[in-house]
Every structure is written in C-alpha cells, then in structure tokens.
Amino acid sequence: PMTVGQLVKAVYRAKELGLLVDLCCDSAEEAKMLATLKPNCLICEPTSLIGTGKTASETYMQEVVNAIHAISDDIIICIGAGTKNGNDVYNAIKNGAQCAGGSSGIFAAENPHAVILDMLDGFKRAIADFPRWQR
C-alpha cells in the first residue's frame, strides 16, 4: 500500500513518463478522490466482492460513476468484482461504465474461452443498447 502522498507522486511521475494510469477504488468516496488525480482509468470494485463471483449492486455502480463524472467525464470507468458472464458486463455498461473487469471470472471458469466469448457478446449488446459509453 501507498500513502496518499506516495500515490500522488507516483501518478504524476507516470504521467511525466507518458504512461497510462489506472487506479483502483473500493467506494464512491475513493473514486471521487482518485478522480481528482485524472487517471486514464478508474477500476471500481468493492474489495469485499473480489473473487467471490458476486457482482457489485446497481446502486454501487451508479454511485461510483456519478462520483467520477462529478470530477471528470474523461476518465474511463471499469466496474469489477464478480464479473463472470456477458450479463455482468452488460449491466456494468448499462450503469455507466465503459468496461468491466473479469479476471477471476475467466480464470476460475471451467471453460475460460466460452466465458470470454460470452463477455464479448455482453459488451456488444451493451454498446448497441447504450451507445453513450463511447466518449
């Protein structure tokens, strides 16, 4: 873990070097604070749900999206934790994210290839239904 001061220095240094900056947050409060650093992407996932197969609630998704947009519309929002299929990806985008994280949902699956294809299908359906995700 980093202190806030260390995190700020690391973000500024990464930007100086031309690196993309992705930060993770647990709550809407953290999302809002981290959004002030203007990362390229904020990966939002309740820590308690990581690896559980349980997805974040629609309320959580909407709260983090609104918190980030209150600071900047230029930050890519990724909703993670519990994403295991195309419907989970669809719901993340429906609730304002541009993408969804699903590492344990893929790696723990019996057929990871099929899960990836299902997630891509959910993404395609979501961008057809919610074209506003493209900023």
Predicted features and spans:
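Glycine-rich phosphate-binding active-site loops on the catalytic face of alpha/beta enzymes
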Residues: 1-5, 41-54, 95-116
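Hydrophobic, well-structured mid-protein blocks that either form specific transmembrane helices
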Residues: 1-34
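C-terminal helical cap(s) of enzyme catalytic domains, especially alpha/beta-barrels
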Residues: 7-16, 56-59, 104-135
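Generic hydrophobic/aromatic pocket-lining and core-packing "Φ" positions
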Residues: 11, 31, 65, 89-90, ...
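CE4/NodB-like, metal-dependent polysaccharide N-deacetylase domain
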Residues: 13-21, 67-72, 125-126
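Catalytic cores of alpha/beta
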Residues: 23-38, 77, 82-100
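Glycine/Thr-rich beta-alpha phosphate-binding loop at enzyme active sites
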Residues: 39-66, 70, 75-78, 84, ...
